[in-house]
Amino acid sequence: MEFYGLIGEKLSHSLSPKIHNTLFKDLKIEGAYKLFEVEKENLGKLIESIKLLKIKGVNVTIPYKQDVMEYLDFISDEAKKIGAVNTIYLEDNKLYGYNTDYYGFGTILNNNEIVIRDNVAMVLGNGGAAKAVITYLLDHGIKKIYLVSRKIKGNSADKDERIEFKTYEEISEIKGDILINTTPLGMYPKVDDTPVNEDIINNFNSLIDIIYNPRETRFLKIGKNSNKKVCGGIEMLVGQAIKAEEIWQECQLDNKLTQGLYSIFENEFK
């Protein structure tokens, strides 16, 4: 039996156990995926216990994606750029850290044939999720990113001449190719919220919302009614889990299996 888990603060509503246990079944792995709720002062002890108990892999969620980094033996390039780790792999008693949110966002783009090279994107929000999105866009040839936040502030992922900071009051005339919501506005239960109005949405061709509950946010519904290409966050959620599993199992998962997983979890939310 192999053991895996999720480290965080409040985990009772997490879909991670269901996703990974479904993957274990499909891959015929005798695995168990547990939830590890921990207070910040005990995080170091928990990380050390991963080695002692030979837990093969863990995911990390808020608020510990930055805090775990000091306990790791290796951190991948994308995780260093983003400044956060959400996947840890134990091998030869060493802990390896990765950021699979980066790959999960790439899954949305690839599955929906959204081209980013030489295009213009606007990213709404400047929190932890935005860092993974911005890093992926920069690494894959985006021409320009407008980074929109209520308060203009930089982080390690933002030191690139292709990024221009804007407040919400400054974006009404900006036109581009891809509009990406990384804020929680529109998330269940406040499903009538939207980060921007129809006039701004109509200035873009494709909309991505990394929220997965509800499946189609008001932000996406407005875009859909204007005949925009719209993509919700369930593919990012499942995509980052698939990448974590590929790291732990040291293999690439079959495309038929992964597409089946998207279908299963698309029906989790209305």
UniProtKB/Swiss-Prot annotation:
Keyword Ligase in annotation: no
One annotated GO molecular function: shikimate 3-dehydrogenase (NADP+) activity
GO terms for biological process, alphabetical: amino acid biosynthetic process; aromatic amino acid family biosynthetic process; chorismate biosynthetic process; shikimate metabolic process
Highest taxon in the source lineage: Bacteria
Pathway(s) served: Metabolic intermediate biosynthesis; chorismate biosynthesis; chorismate from D-erythrose 4-phosphate and phosphoenolpyruvate: step 4/7
Active site: K65 (proton acceptor)
Keywords: Amino-acid biosynthesis, Aromatic amino acid biosynthesis, NADP, Oxidoreductase
Subunit structure, interactors included: Homodimer.
Similarity field: Belongs to the shikimate dehydrogenase family.
Protein name (database record): Shikimate dehydrogenase (NADP(+))
Organism whose genome encodes this protein: Clostridium beijerinckii (strain ATCC 51743 / NCIMB 8052) (Clostridium acetobutylicum)
Name of the gene: aroE
